[in-house]
Amino acid sequence: MLNVNFVNEASSTNQGLVVFIDEQLKLDSNLIGLDQQHHGLISKTIQNKLQFTGKYGQIKVIPSVIKSGEVRYLIIAGLGNEEKLTEAKIEELGGKILQHATSCKISTIGLKITNRISRFTSQTFASLVASGAFLASYRFDKYRTTLKEAEKFAVESIEIFTDNSTETAKLFEIKKLIAEAVFFTRDISNEPSNIKTPQVYAERIVDRLEPLGVDVDVIGEREMKNLGMGALLGVGQGSQNESKLVVMEYKGGSKDVPTIALVGKGVIFDTGGISLKPSSDMHLMRYDMGGSAAVVGTIIAVAGQKLPVNIVGVVGLVENMLSGNAQRPGDVVTTMSGQTAEVLNTDAEGRLVLADAVWYAQEKFKPKCVIDVATLTGAITIALGNTYAGCFSNNDELADKLIKVGEEVNEKLWRMPLHDEYDAMIHSDIADMANIANVPRAAGSCIAAHFIKRFIKDGVDWAHLDIAGVANSNKASALGPKGAVGYGVRLLEKFIKEYT
């Protein structure tokens, strides 16, 4: 794991030294002295606009001309227009710096924070850069046994020189704790489905959360049957691995602090069931539990900080598999709420899992607010691509708060519509509702949201986040490699911290 330290005075023991330059291409007094130490290398570089323009995100790695000392490289990072810098952009810049250092095999980095950006203190700026670098250091290579030495290379440490290093370190410790929660979410999402069975996944949740003072209850199929969870159990009935409902309760607030319930879809692997998925990308269905992973990661972050809030997490862990016992198209299931659902398509299974999970959360904990998170529909990816998750809500204020926080942490949400006409499209002739629309290929994400909405009680504020397009990525970003993104943890953690 990347080691991050904050110091008040610069050290000469790092192989790479990072400085920040904005698009004005001017050196402040501190950088002038550093430039002189390096025989004008910084000023010569920024004078040549073919080499460096100072635009945001530009990174220039230059071999040092100093013959003595440990510094082998100067790394010049572009800030662009300082007025347009956001916390998210600063974090991403930290990630880019780490990635460039890794590609250049620079094992130790020093960062010199000399810039005075009006909207950010040097402590905030430094902690954000460190947070981005730490997030970008994540790897999932535990099953790669033949990695070459060059592929194993990782930056060992970052040392950040800034005023008031003690205060900066405190800011970073919170960000590091949140990043480690993101890492749990990425880890469990990246894990192959033959390893992370519902039982194993539940055990990992217990092992991670109980030391943080979170009460965890793992409910098996017998108890779920007694509770009447026919929708969730129907999804998992084709698997030889028993389905689980994991209930997490963090009681950090007083009794008069309203409870927020986070509910996650945890389909460990989704074949589509008898309504079989195409084989080409079916291996990616190991990520179909990304919503549940975001819920668990959020509770790790909240409990780790001992926030004065009351949070409940409920995740339904199932496998949607083919067998002689698998659920059939046309089956009717009775949900915990007593409502019945006709299963017209076994690949629309996530909403069935959530139906029982959100009802259980409301029945047992009486929350003021329910937020469910799910890799629910391919339709949301068609609508929004891989930039935004879809946000459906019965409460404008709740939706606005989530969207605002999403912009701040760069986990973007786009408000999607709910309408009575969509609700009418899940009519069934033989049950209370159908799990897909009676109009083929129409408004798929909206239809799924309305199915879940049928299980939200009157007076409960509700938001449904469809993260199917953003939970995993087929390319690296500034904050991590391709694979599981860990989307939702930072969004929900900040929402809970700021608005409860």
UniProtKB/Swiss-Prot annotation:
Residues of the active site: 277, 351
SUPFAM superfamilies: Macro domain-like, Zn-dependent exopeptidases
Catalytic class of the enzyme: hydrolase
Catalytic activity: Release of an N-terminal amino acid, Xaa-|-Yaa-, in which Xaa is preferably Leu, but may be other amino acids including Pro although not Arg or Lys, and Yaa may be Pro. Amino acid amides and methyl esters are also readily hydrolyzed, but rates on arylamides are exceedingly low; Release of an N-terminal amino acid, preferentially leucine, but not glutamic or aspartic acids
Gene name of the record: pepA
Required co-factors: Mn(2+)
GO biological process: proteolysis
Keyword Protease set for record: yes
Protein name listed in UniProt: Probable cytosol aminopeptidase
Similarity-based family: Belongs to the peptidase M17 family.
Protein's job: Presumably involved in the processing and regular turnover of intracellular proteins. Catalyzes the removal of unsubstituted N-terminal amino acids from various peptides.
InterPro entries named in the record: Leucine_aapep/pepB, Macro_dom-like, Peptidase_M17_C, Peptidase_M17_leu_NH2_pept, Peptidase_M17_N
UniProt main location, coarse: cytoplasm
Keywords (A to Z) from UniProt: Aminopeptidase, Cytoplasm, Hydrolase, Manganese, Metal-binding, Protease
Cellular location(s): Cytoplasm
EC number: 3.4.11.1, 3.4.11.10
Positions that bind Mn(2+) 1: 270, 347, 349
